[in-house]
């Protein structure tokens, strides 16, 4: 059986167990979270969902009456990297993909237990999974299983059924009786029987009904034997296979000493003249030895408690349990009141126990407490520590605090992009709209709507193109040549007025500050090398202010220590640089609006002689 540095070898699940759910099975995940909540867990057992067909996202689920967000990852590698504490996977992959996904999961050493829910996994594939699991020291539950449950700790997928059934079977707190069965449906019946005849279930596993389960009866019974909290075991076998005989041998040779109450389902099969299969792929007898009658007799002779019929199993179980209580082996604990189960909003509105799904998600600010917070930083602290507008941008846009040189750079960008005179398209649109008598918002928006790939919108493109070329290892000349072959302009290169001999002072200011304060300027250096190539062809193909700000911004994100490379690239792709231009230029556009209003400028009409009329 699999072991762990933190857990004894017999323990698969505990109150601290964290799991992935493979497949978009939000209903099953919600059931697991509801069970966690009922058991008094402080942290949900499901750390994330792995869904290979979608994009990385989040899934909204309930934790009690509140909503929480679970990450959804596209790859197993990413999920394991982000959540190294996870060691269990509930695999809801279909029968077609269960093999491939399980084999991939076993490549990650942190995974020590996988429950395969799918039915119909080809037997050859199931055997391959079995062999690999033993090599990798991974416990496999299934295929074709509902899973398992450890009351008060963890449940696999839909094990245990609805919440009312879980409460009725007292699965929210541990008992002393552990069981193992093939059938998931019959495991629910065992939960019910054990809860009414003993102090409850300690752990229950349904190994699955296929012919080649990843683990068998004996595997789990040996675990239960080693677990001091388990005092009594129940085995529910069935016609077909010989796994019950391995249990018999373990009882005879003393490997298993704890009492077992057992029954093999399918005794009526001996009444049929031909071979009969009872539902599961492995539930048919190939010989007299595999019949339920023979198994029950053999178990009875080995000293296992076996009733005359299944109907008498509850009474026998209660008798054995009470005997252990009298001997002091089991000390019943005081019964705890069943926890309240959160109800859906429509049912619980009048009672005040509501689940109201939110329509929007906000992760940057919160106005619900006594004080407004920006990314959990109180507004008073923003002023006490003089974070400034750069600090506020770092909190609300980048969701973290940046070093002072970084926030000053953000403010520098806003100052440099605030205005570029009245003749550029954005300012002209704002001026004309203002002179038409429109209000500030309308005039501002008129100017902002001109921002795009030709005006002001080159920052994101420059950041992306230079980053891509640098990361790909292209030399500056190779980058320029590739753009020329693609008939594509290089974003951030070129100026209508400025040139190498008439440099843009704004660019010089940015370069000077960045070279002095940034820990690394690799992308800026790369862009300047590209400029050397482009200006050798034409003097005005310089690194303009958009391009300079863009590459310096990438250097900031990648080297300030607050972001991973993945996070830095994500923010660039989100359009944050164009956001900086929009925010900065809004200052100037508002200035032009106020200027025209103050001058009481009349309605503007463009002169005829500035148009070429063709009709």
Swiss-Prot record:
Protein origin, superkingdom? Eukaryota
Keyword annotations from UniProtKB, A to Z: ATP-binding, Cytoplasm, Lipid biosynthesis, Lipid metabolism, Magnesium, Metal-binding, Nucleotide-binding, Phosphoprotein, Transferase
Q: Which reaction does it catalyse?
A: oxaloacetate + acetyl-CoA + ADP + phosphate = citrate + ATP + CoA
Q: Give the E.C. number(s).
A: 2.3.3.8
Q: Where does Mg(2+) bind?
A: 238
Q: Binding residues for ATP, per the UniProt record?
A: 221-241, 272-298
* Pfam families in UniProt: Citrate_synt, CoA_binding, Ligase_CoA
Gene Ontology biological-process annotations: acetyl-CoA biosynthetic process; citrate metabolic process; fatty acid biosynthetic process
PTM Phosphoserine: at which residues? 359
Subcellular compartments? Cytoplasm
**Which coarse location class applies to the principal site listed for this UniProt protein?**
cytoplasm
Q: What are the positions of the active site? A: 280 (tele-phosphohistidine intermediate)
Residues annotated to bind CoA: 299-309
GO molecular function (one) = ATP citrate synthase activity
Coiled-coil segments? none
- According to its record, what are the GO cellular component terms? cytosol; nucleus
The EC class name is transferase
Complexes and interactors = Composed of two subunits.
- What family does this belong to? Belongs to the succinate/malate CoA ligase alpha subunit family.
Designated name of the protein? Probable ATP-citrate synthase subunit 1
Q: Which organism is it from?
A: Schizosaccharomyces pombe (strain 972 / ATCC 24843) (Fission yeast)
């Amino acid at each position: 059986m699999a072991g762990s540095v933190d857990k004894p070898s017999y323990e698969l699940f505990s109150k601290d167990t964290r799991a992935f759910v493979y497949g978009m099975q939000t209903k099953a995940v919600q059931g697991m979270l509801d069970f966690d909540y009922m058991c008094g867990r402080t942290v949900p057992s499901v750390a994330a969902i792995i869904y290979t067909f979608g994009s990385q996202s989040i899934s909204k689920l309930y934790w009690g009456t509140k909503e929480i967000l679970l990450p959804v990852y596209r790859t197993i590698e990413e999920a394991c990297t982000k959540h190294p504490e996870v060691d269990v996977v509930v695999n809801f992959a279909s029968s077609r993909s269960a093999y491939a996904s399980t084999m991939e999961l076993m490549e990650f050493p942190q995974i020590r237990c996988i429950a395969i829910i799918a039915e119909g996994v080809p037997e050859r594939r199931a055997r391959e999974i079995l062999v690999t699991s033993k090599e990798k020291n991974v416990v496999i539950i299934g295929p074709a299983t509902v899973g398992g449950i450890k009351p008060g700790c963890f449940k696999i997928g839909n094990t245990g059924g609805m919440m009312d059934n879980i409460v009725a079977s007292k699965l929210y707190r541990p008992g002393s009786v552990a069981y193992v069965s093939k059938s998931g449906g019959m495991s629910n019946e065992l939960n019910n029987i054990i809860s009414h005849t003993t102090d409850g279930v300690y752990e229950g596993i349904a190994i699955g009904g296929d012919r080649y389960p990843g683990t068998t009866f004996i595997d789990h019974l040996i675990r239960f034997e080693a677990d001091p909290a388990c005092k009594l075991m129940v085995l529910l076998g069935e016609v077909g296979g010989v796994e019950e005989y391995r249990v018999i041998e373990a009882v005879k040779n003393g490997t298993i000493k704890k009492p077992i109450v057992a029954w093999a389902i399918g005794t009526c099969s001996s009444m049929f003249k031909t071979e009969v299969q009872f539902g599961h792929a492995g539930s048919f007898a190939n010989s007299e030895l595999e019949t339920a009658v023979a198994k029950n007799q053999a178990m009875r002779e080995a000293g296992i408690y076996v009733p005359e019929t299944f109907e008498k199993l509850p009474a026998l179980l209660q008798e054995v349990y009470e005997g252990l209580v009298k001997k002091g082996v089991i000390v019943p604990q005081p019964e705890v009141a069943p926890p309240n189960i959160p109800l859906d909003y429509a049912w619980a509105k009048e009672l005040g126990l509501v689940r109201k799904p939110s329509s929007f998600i906000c992760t940057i600010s919160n106005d619900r407490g006594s004080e407004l917070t920006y990314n959990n930083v109180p507004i008073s602290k923003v002023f006490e520590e003089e974070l400034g507008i750069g600090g506020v941008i770092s909190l609300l846009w980048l969701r973290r605090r940046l070093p002072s040189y970084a926030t000053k750079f953000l403010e520098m960008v806003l100052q440099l992009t605030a205005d570029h005179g009245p003749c550029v398209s954005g300012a002209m649109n704002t001026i004309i709209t203002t002179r038409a008598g429109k209000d500030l918002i309308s005039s501002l928006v008129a100017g902002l709507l001109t921002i795009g790939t030709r005006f002001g919108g080159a920052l994101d493109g420059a950041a992306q193109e230079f980053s891509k070329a640098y990361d790909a290892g292209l030399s500056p000349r190779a980058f320029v040549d590739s753009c020329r072959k693609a008939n594509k302009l290089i974003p951030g290169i070129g100026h209508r007025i400025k040139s190498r001999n008439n440099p843009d002072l704004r660019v010089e200011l940015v370069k000077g500050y960045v070279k002095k304060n940034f820990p690394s300027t690799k992308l800026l250096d790369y862009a300047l090398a590209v400029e050397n190539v482009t200006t050798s062809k034409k003097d005005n193909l310089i690194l303009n202010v958009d391009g300079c700000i863009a590459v310096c911004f990438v250097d900031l994100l990648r080297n300030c220590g607050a972001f991973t490379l993945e996070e830095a690239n994500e923010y660039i792709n989100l359009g944050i640089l164009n956001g900086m231009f929009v925010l900065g230029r809004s200052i100037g556009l508002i200035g032009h609006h106020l200027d025209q209003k103050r001058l009481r400028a009349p309605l503007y009409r463009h002169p005829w002689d500035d148009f070429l009329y063709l009709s």
